[in-house]
From Swiss-Prot:
Pathway: Cofactor biosynthesis; FMN biosynthesis; FMN from riboflavin (ATP route): step 1/1
Domain of life: Eukaryota
Stored Pfam families: Flavokinase (PF01687)
Name by which UniProt lists this protein: Riboflavin kinase
Lineage: Eukaryota, Fungi, Dikarya, Ascomycota, Saccharomycotina
Amino-acid positions noted as binding Mg(2+) in the UniProt annotation, renumbered to this chain: 39, 41
Cellular component GO terms held in the UniProt record: mitochondrion
Source organism of this protein record: Scheffersomyces stipitis (strain ATCC 58785 / CBS 6054 / NBRC 10063 / NRRL Y-11545)
Gene field: FMN1
């Protein structure tokens, strides 16, 4: 399937905004390492599960927790430290733009549906276990399969560009207050 043209409405339209509170969990370990596009994975709840698979955009905000660090094992066997966002800086705690993939990620042949949030910000540390509040303000495109990793990265970068242009509009800026 070819990438469809993206038409972003002047303001969020029903069913948006969708506001969610969640927690960042470890994912598959490929967003940063393989693609250079880190993601904050979140559990799929009933609201997210009802959305059409694809790419969405909106705003998000991280909040650290005071829980002690803990070590957890990813599905690939690698261990990760859940620091619950304790190392986040003030700049990391601002409301930030995001794109989110919900689906099966056909390029990677996932066996379970995933929600992966790419926060458009440079972080110095991981923040597994941190709280995340976000809103979904619109839909960019359906999930697609790719023949190369480079084509996937190119499309993700286009999604980011589209999201940033949409979120720069006054009507979307009003939803920045989470």
């Amino acid at each position: 399937m070819a990438r469809p043209d993206t038409v972003i409405p002047d303001k969020p339209e029903s069913p948006y905004p969708i506001v969610q509170d969640s927690v960042v969990v470890s994912g598959f370990g490929r967003g940063s390492s393989e693609l250079g596009i880190p993601t904050a994975n979140i559990p799929i709840n009933d609201d997210l599960n009802q959305l059409e698979t694809g790419i969405y955009y909106g705003w998000c905000q991280l909040k650290p927790c005071t829980l002690p660090d803990e070590c957890k094992t990813r599905t690939n066997g690698r261990e990760v430290i859940y620091n619950h966002g304790k190392n986040l800086r003030n700049d990391d705690l601002k409301v930030l733009p995001m794109v989110m993939s919900i689906g099966w990620n056909p390029f990677y042949h996932l066996k379970e549906k995933a929600a992966e949030v790419h926060i458009m910000h440079k972080f110095d540390d991981f923040f597994y276990g941190a709280q995340i509040k976000f809103n979904v303000l619109g839909y960019i495109r359906p999930e697609l399969d790719y023949t190369t990793k480079e084509a996937l990265i190119e499309d993700i970068n286009l999604d980011i560009k589209i999201a940033l242009e949409a979120l720069d509009r006054d009507a979307y800026q009003t939803y920045k207050d989470l």
